[in-house]
Amino acid sequence: MRIAFVVLLGAHGLIHLLGASKAFGWADVQQLRTPISALGGTFWLVAAILLVGAATCFALGAQWWWWFGLPGMVLSQVLIAQSWSDAKVGTLANMVIAIPLLLLLLDARPGSFRSRFARDRDALMALPAHPMSLVTETDLTILPPLMQGYLRRVGAIGRPHVRNLRVTFDARMRSSATSPWMQATATQYEFFNPPARLFYMNATRTGMPIDIFHRYVGSAATFQVRIASLFSMVDKSGPVLTRAETVTLMNDIVVMAPAAVLDLPFTWKTIGERALLATFTNAGNMVSATLAFDAAGDLVGFLSSDRTQEDAKGSRNVPWSTPISGYREVDGIRIGALGDANWVEPSGEWTYGQFEIRSIAYNVTR
């Protein structure tokens, strides 16, 4: 779908060169019978540049592609109206181009998930913050040996304690083991004093844009999904969801900001040569998970029975697993950049989410 839109946008822009060619005598354009002045030809050329520029920006994933696309589409339609008998079919292309532009407009309104996400982020960023001291070997003495080794491997020693993080993902999601995958991108902010989590995802299913917003601030979590920023698919809240989101928060901490365990209410119990039982408490919710480490000391597995699976029949406790791999250095920290989200059902384990970290930054101000 993305490629098709880029091709349409780019081709539509290039076609406008016909108007410029006719006006400046670059070519004998028999398809355009309406006379075009030199000034008119300049406008046709500008429309071509704007639309091709928009296609290029869209192909590169630039969010501001509409800076070119919107004026290009408007100018294009004005020119088409002036040469209606020859160019009216171009209106169909402009109608298609108008759809994502309309969705962007809806996304910018105050009640959209994107706007709410930004307001929550700014409010949490505005909370008083104190300078963060550096993590030392002495700090690690409160942890079991497996966690000490893990923090050394990720490179936490000598870096500041973690106040917050910002991470972006490429992702694939599906609703069942047999459902088709939908592509997605996501941005997440995590705060650790006090703990909070904001997760905003854009996905596409059969060409339809879907917005997903997880919000866990204070003692309550919400989970909402909308189609095209307008039509609600999911709107959940309450203690069961908050407990499940506490597990997600715990997972994010040990995977993406392991040094934050030094400043949060975690307890530990060694249950094997390469496994720990970790317990985390937040907002009255105490949740646990088994952390598995490989021979090198990297965290490779997280398994919790305190998370609920939501389906058409309601919610039920199902073991939740997140295998972790693809360790590499990101923003000076060595983390597992690849992760799956799995449900471990009696019939077997299946993956409903696959995530790859594109970027991560710690102690951010924006």
Regions found by a protein language model. Give the residues of each.
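Short solvent-exposed loop/turn micro-motifs enriched in small/polar/acidic residues
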Residues: W181-Q183, V261, I271, A283-M286, ...
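Gly/Pro-enriched, hydrophobic low-complexity segments
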Residues: L277-V364
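N-terminal mature ectodomain segment of secretory-pathway/periplasmic proteins
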Residues: Q148-F231
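Short amphipathic beta-strand and strand-loop transition segments with alternating hydrophobic
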Residues: Y189, P265-T270, S325-G326
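Flexible, processing/modification-adjacent segments and terminal tails
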Residues: Q224-N282, S315
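N-terminal leader/targeting segments and the immediate start of mature chains
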Residues: F113-R166
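Short, hydrophobic/aromatic-rich segments at coil-to-beta transitions
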Residues: H161-T168, F192-Y200, I271-T279, V300-G301, ...
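Membrane-interface extramembranous regions
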Residues: M1-S112
